[in-house]
Design a protein with these regions (language model features):
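Bacterial Sec-dependent N-terminal signal peptides
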Residues: 1-25
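Long, low-complexity ectodomains and other extracytoplasmic segments of secretory-pathway proteins
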Residues: 20-45, 51, 55-57, 113-130
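Short, solvent-exposed loop/turn segments enriched in Ser/Thr/Gly
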Residues: 42-49, 98-105
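Surface-exposed binding patches on compact interaction domains or structured appendages
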Residues: 57-88
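Extracytoplasmic/periplasmic beta-strand context in beta-sandwich domains
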Residues: 63, 104, 117-119
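A mature extracytoplasmic/lumenal domain signature
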Residues: 64-66, 93-95, 123-125
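Short, surface-exposed loop/turn segments at beta-strand-coil junctions that are enriched for proline
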Residues: 94-100, 111
């Protein structure tokens, strides 16, 4: 019985330590993680700036930001984002050659507790009227 209690205590402490380790690093919080442009005309370019805040206790380092296709181009801060500070990820979408519902996903790779975050640009691309 004592061994069981000791084992239980060990696992409880391990879980608490793991939870503490995960929350003591950088944490990304987005003001919004998607934007819907509604109907746009084929060939139109749209852009949005996603604002993020590092709500963690360590500097946030964004190592890469990647889009699902070449029609979506992100730009992001290359310098660390201090705890409590905000930064911007700017994303543009070129609808040339696209028709119908579009959902361009952008992945943000960082040292945050959740190392991959996603934001998306949603639109419905209409054929141009001649």
């Amino acid at each position: 019985m004592k061994k069981l209690a000791l084992l239980f205590s060990f696992f409880t402490l391990a879980l608490v330590y793991q939870a503490q380790a995960q929350t003591s690093g950088a944490v990304i919080s987005f003001k919004e993680n998607s934007i819907d442009f509604g109907d746009i005309t084929q060939g139109q370019q749209v852009a949005h700036t996603f604002v993020l805040t590092n709500t963690g206790k360590q500097p946030l380092i964004i190592s890469n930001v990647a889009a699902t296709c070449g029609c979506t181009v992100p730009s992001w801060p290359k310098e660390p984002v201090a705890p409590g500070k905000s930064a911007e990820i700017k994303v543009s979408f070129n609808s040339a050659g696209k028709v119908g519902k579009q959902n361009s996903v952008v992945r943000i790779y960082s040292n945050a507790s959740e190392p991959i975050e996603k934001v998306s640009l949603i639109s419905n691309v209409l054929n141009p009227t001649n």
